[in-house]
UniProtKB/Swiss-Prot annotation:
E.C. numbers: 2.7.1.43
Gene source species: Arabidopsis thaliana (Mouse-ear cress)
Pfam family, one: GHMP_kinases_N
Name of this protein: Probable glucuronokinase 2
Enzyme class: transferase
Entry keyword set: ATP-binding, Carbohydrate metabolism, Cobalt, Kinase, Magnesium, Manganese, Metal-binding, Nucleotide-binding, Transferase
Gene assigned in the entry: GLCAK2
Binding-site positions, ATP: P126, R127, Q128, T129, G130, L131, S132, G133, S134, S135, A136
Molecular functions (GO terms): ATP binding; glucuronokinase activity; metal ion binding
Entry cofactors: Mg(2+); Mn(2+); Co(2+)
Length: 366
């Protein structure tokens, strides 16, 4: 992919639309978004997914030449690909969002023209790293559909994460709204309140954009061999639904970390921020257990903590966000430890909110 990608929207005059959606870091409060909690999340400029929609005579969902590969050198090569990358590429994601988008518009009286299109995608988000790669593809595709059908102002921005999540649910993907909110808001730092009362009333949370510059310098650690981010919630959710007091109280404490984190960020109290990040991971570990989290994922956190940095999962495993409060000297130690352990480490690239004027107009006043 182009390391210097085009603007989010291009080619309006000829009916061609291109959109990017960035990888996401769950900074504090995750995974309480699935449990009526609170989170702080943001997207990063390090990785992104890209979708392109162009008018065509027939409706075509275009397979990716690598991610949707159907031709192999040998049977062994086919099996190797399936064992490492699974059975699924991005075509199913594009088809699912097309279905969910069309049904939502039909159910809500939003008229769509009858022109056809070709929809394609690309992505450089590492697979299974807990950076929300699947929803980034769906988010980028949804943005293309909104523009192609000229219905951006008819579908409020708060509703769009639900459409993305519903598309993923069609495919059996286990997730919450947090990632989709961060990606729909297109950058910036977002505080999210998923309180049950509000969710039951309107179907989405209370989303507040914060200044991305409140964040201290952060780093990303990830491993090239993937983690399974689709099964991590399963056992804990069942216990939560069964009324397990330990799970319920621990999840409430994780949600509280997002509130404390918002205060710490506004005050730039980074020493407290370090403690909150570490506490977030410790609570997750106590609920899910080491076997569920995976030895390599835990090792990434411990590599950072070994040199006195704060660390937690960006999502459900596969990547870790790190804060080095002591600055460049501590970053050098982090880089050396990651090199020894075979992990990739790089600075987090922050991106400001990319909401357009038409998007902002759809924000509810409630």
């Amino acid at each position: 992919m182009d390391p210097n990608p085009k603007p989010a929207i291009s080619g309006k005059d000829n009916g061609v639309f291109e959109h990017r959606s960035f990888a996401r870091i769950g900074f504090l409060g995750n995974p309480s978004d699935v449990y009526f909690g609170r989170t702080i999340s943001f997207t990063i400029g390090n990785f992104w997914a890209w979708a392109k929609l162009e008018p065509s005579d027939h409706l075509l969902i275009k397979p990716h030449p690598f991610h949707d590969l159907v031709q192999f050198d040998s049977l062994d090569n086919l099996v190797y690909r399936l064992e490492n990358d699974g059975y699924y590429g991005g075509v199913r994601l594009l088809m699912a969002i097309c279905k969910v988008f069309r049904n939502y518009c039909k159910e809500n009286g939003i008229q769509l023209h009858d022109k056809n299109f070709t929809l394609s995608y690309d992505t450089n988000i590492p697979r299974q790293t807990g950076l929300s790669g699947s929803s980034a593809i769906v988010s980028a595709a949804l943005s293309c559909l909104l523009d192609f059908y000229n219905v951006r102002q008819s579908i409020r921005i708060e509703v769009r994460p639900n459409l993305i999540l519903n598309a993923e649910k069609e495919l059996g993907i286990v997730a919450g709204l947090q990632d989709r909110v961060a990606q729909v808001y297109g950058g910036g730092l977002v505080h999210m309140d998923f309180s049950k009362e509000h969710m039951d009333k309107v179907g989405y949370g209370i989303y507040t954009i914060m200044d991305i510059n409140l964040l201290p310098p952060l780093h990303l650690i990830y491993a090239e061999n993937p983690s399974d981010s689709g099964k991590v919630h399963s056992t804990v959710r069942r216990r939560w639904l069964d009324g397990d007091e330990f799970i319920i109280s621990s999840m409430a404490e994780i949600a509280k970390l997002a509130e404390e984190g918002r205060t710490a960020l506004l005050k730039k109290d980074y020493s407290n921020l370090k403690e909150l990040m570490n506490r977030n991971f410790d609570l997750r570990r106590s609920m899910f257990g080491d076997e569920c989290l995976g030895a390599m994922n835990i090792e990434m956190v411990e590599v950072a903590r070994k040199i006195g940095a704060a660390a937690k999962f960006t999502g459900s495993g596969g990547a870790v966000v790190v804060f080095c409060p002591e600055g460049p000297s501590q970053v050098k130690l982090l880089e050396e430890e990651c090199r020894k352990s075979g992990f990739i480490v790089e600075p987090v690239k922050l991106v400001p909110t990319r909401l357009s004027s038409s998007d902002i107009k759809t924000l509810s006043k409630t």
